[in-house]
Amino acid sequence: MISVGIVGGTGYTGVELLRILLRHPKAQVRVLTSRTEAGKPVADMFPNLRGHTDLHFSDLNIDALKECDVVFFATPHGVAMQHAKDLIAAGTKVIDLAADFRLQNLEQFEKWYGMEHACPDVLKDSVYGLTELNREKIKQAQVIGNPGCYPTTVQLGLAPLLKSAQALIETKNIIIDAKSGVSGAGRKASLGMIYSENADNFKAYGVAGHRHHPEIVEALENIAGKKDVFEGLLFVPHLVPMIRGMLSTIYVDLTEAGKQTDLQALYENFYANEKFVDVMPANSSPETRSVRGANELRIALYKPQPNKLIILAAQDNLVKGASGQAVQNMNLMFGFNEDEGLQGIGLLP
């Protein structure tokens, strides 16, 4: 049984981590911090956890966190990097659900997040936690940068094409049209997130530039093993009036080799042994409700024209897009079965 700390337990990803870990047979949450709710019983804030935990929120105490085997940071950007060095020096592993350890390019990090990186030496040795593509590195990692929710759908949606020995798509012409529920913006109060602003509404945001764009580009370059081939990639996120769920529609142009390839078979073979990636039959329609609450991503392919491919990827942004994937990474780091604590089936209806 490993000891777990969660920094930032009152946000949506923090409480989702707790919900998942309370069912984990080999992990016990010992520390759950909150800047504003210290001393308050967790079940008073989250009634779904009544009868499942007697934990209270506490102030952030680095010495208490050092007693844990692993600490998750479900905090705003910039928090994990302030504490990572002290924790790993004490032998504690770190999994950050914010962006502190996602981008290896410091210039891009500082541009998009508006802060200097506090521990570039730790960043250099950290591992990007896209589980299905970085398993062996994750097993050896001390610090994990958990991927963003949108980048998770994009990478898993494109990986079979980019990992192929042949160039199957035109990498400079990729268009990503992505939609997310409002929980992706976090739990903090803001005018744009209140009910009357979002109900009966559907809007694009970050059209001129979104923080996940440089993460997507850097990650795809690593998957493809090529630099500067995704300059023309377009990424536009949208906000839909639902709480959780994400659907990314990815448009690509096929090369001559791509036109001749059985792409359905390519995807099915690539993900044949993956428990948390479901390749649906061709021309299917993955629905966000089918993965609600589950650590699963569903993919479907359409080929409307001989030289065009459309990839649909659906996930729960709080689970496979955040906390579930973080626990998946924790399982690898400690030698557990990858699906420990993550066998839950999506909630439907």
Swiss-Prot record:
Any one Gene Ontology cellular component term annotated for this protein? cytoplasm
* This protein's UniProt keywords: Amino-acid biosynthesis, Arginine biosynthesis, Cytoplasm, NADP, Oxidoreductase
Establish whether keyword Cytoplasm is in the entry.
yes
Q: Name the EC number(s).
A: 1.2.1.38
Under the heading Pfam families, the entry gives: Semialdhyde_dh, Semialdhyde_dhC_1
The keyword NAD is assigned to this record: no
What is one Gene Ontology biological process annotated in the Swiss-Prot or TrEMBL record? L-arginine biosynthetic process
Pathway entry:
Amino-acid biosynthesis; L-arginine biosynthesis; N(2)-acetyl-L-ornithine from L-glutamate: step 3/4
Signal sequence span is: none
Catalytic residues as annotated in Swiss-Prot or TrEMBL: C149
Query: PROSITE patterns recorded for this chain?
Result: ARGC
Subcellular location(s): the record lists: Cytoplasm
Q: Say which family it is in.
A: Belongs to the NAGSA dehydrogenase family. Type 1 subfamily.
User: What's the protein name?
Assistant: N-acetyl-gamma-glutamyl-phosphate reductase
